[in-house]
Amino acid sequence: MTYLILLGASICLFPFWEVTMLTLAFIIPMSLTYLNINFTFSFSSELIWLTPIGTALIFLTLMVTLLVLIGTYNIKNYKYIGCLSSLNLVLMMAFCVCDFLTFYVMFEVSLIPTLLLILLWGYQPERMQAGFYLMLYTVTASLPLLLLLLYLYYTVGSLNFYIIMVYYSFNNNPLMLVGLMMAFLVKLPIYTCHLWLPKAHVEAPLGGSMVLAGVLLKLGGYGLYMLINFIISKSSSLVISVIITLSLWGAVIASIICIQQVDIKALVAYSSVAHMSLVSAGILMMSNWSYTCAKMTMIAHGYTSSALFVLANLSYLKIKSRSLMFMKGLLAIFPAMAFYWFLFSCMNMAAPPTLNFIGELLIIPSMYIASYMLLILMCIIMFISAGYSLYMYMTVNHGELGLYITPSIQLKNVDYHVLTAHLLPTFILLIPQLFSV
């Protein structure tokens, strides 16, 4: 893994499209060797620390970065490549560090390349407001986490994961619980902390939306998972129950908002809020089943949401509008693209036999054990999720052909390759050891 990080760092030194593509093509097969590992936690060195979910997220990061470069092959600006490469390196390091302070630094540094992608390659003047919302929400929410990490260091003398788990006894302080978790709940995000996400997605370029939805949101899920396992660990505080309930009700509300959207990118962004709320609820339930559900949902959502933004961009290039009022009848002209719309809409609604389906199915026993009311909420979420996914597919591809469609040719082969590359991992990554607890 150390070699992978060094190779990732070398990309930042030579931010050229060809060099970056060759390096990623070499790193990704190497990262595959870390996926089928039969351990729960393992140290690789004093600084590098691997877990099954961490290695899966590293593979996801590398894959999404590669697909961003292929999907935006017409942008070969060295500044753009440098932003993506540095973000790729920071995320790889975040998913394999062994202490909370280094993770916090990587967590915050990842905002800089993301902000640059939105500000420099966004489409509209509103990108300034989107960047402001991104920094305001994430930085403000992470300040209590920094203060509490300094308190932990003063108390324990180290911020290493295992040392904190052994020597620190959490006292169920409600304010401390909220302060520790707030940064990750905003990053996921859960409903009520989500306003920055639709704005960032709508104003970001294709590459920014793919990385943001595919990987950056998982940084919040990974941080929450580590926090629960090593600091909070089996807490029975009322705050946990309140956040679980808020997450599920937020997922219901976000799903309803999806049906009301007219902007295709905003619809996909709100669907991310709904799915990541399930991730936060699964992690906070602190059972083996719910942990497995959260991990599977994170990985599956990474590929699905990234592909949906690719499809939204391809449809935008044909219509020159993101409005669902104008984006109609594409099946008659672009049947192959409509086929991919159907596949990824099914994955977004968690239809079998995809990883999305297994992830959402496994959370049902945990919901039932916790409370039958939570199970009812989960069923409502799954029902509405199917509704807005079908609504999105039917609106874009069926009906009378829109009057504003521009004359254009069929999709290029590279577009099909990008979409297929998003599709395959959700079937290939059904490895039991990958999601072990």
Swiss-Prot record:
It catalyses: a ubiquinone + NADH + 5 H(+)(in) = a ubiquinol + NAD(+) + 4 H(+)(out). It is a multi-pass membrane protein. Keywords: Electron transport, Membrane, Mitochondrion, NAD, Respiratory chain, Translocase, Transmembrane, Transmembrane helix, Transport, Ubiquinone. GO terms for molecular function: NADH dehydrogenase (ubiquinone) activity; ubiquinone binding. GO terms for cellular component: mitochondrial membrane. The chain crosses the membrane at residues 8-28, 50-70, 78-98, 100-120, 132-152, 177-197, 212-232, 239-259, 266-286, 297-317, 324-344, 361-381, 417-437. The keyword Translocase applies. PANTHER family: NADH-UBIQUINONE OXIDOREDUCTASE CHAIN 4 (PTHR43507:SF20). This is NADH-ubiquinone oxidoreductase chain 4. The gene is ND4.
